[in-house]
Amino acid sequence: MGDDANDAAMPVAPTNPMAAKIILLTDGHCNSACLDAMDLFLSLPGTVHAGTTTAADTIFMDISRVDLPSGLFALGYGHKAWTERPRGSNVPYRPAAQWTYAGDVRDDAAWKAWLDSRLD
């Protein structure tokens, strides 16, 4: 028998509504909303991250930028902070070694050939 208080605190992994394997293909331009989507998709069982390391973001949102009077610098600050986000600030996603692409990310044919070789 479980303790109701402890059972309630344990996160339950969502079921994967997809019958097929989900492969998230990223490069270094995946940031902000892309990382938020990664947070959600990677929580599904059987999801694989492939490609290259993503960018990173912070917990701060709604960023304002103010040029300083000298014109030499600008100050950026967030109005909101996502304090309970599981992924910390400046934490990118890195694919496992066997799913890390080392080729030219601008070469679509090479990406496809590489990914096809992983799926065989």
What are these regions (language model features)?
Residues 1-120:
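C-terminal "post-core" interaction segments
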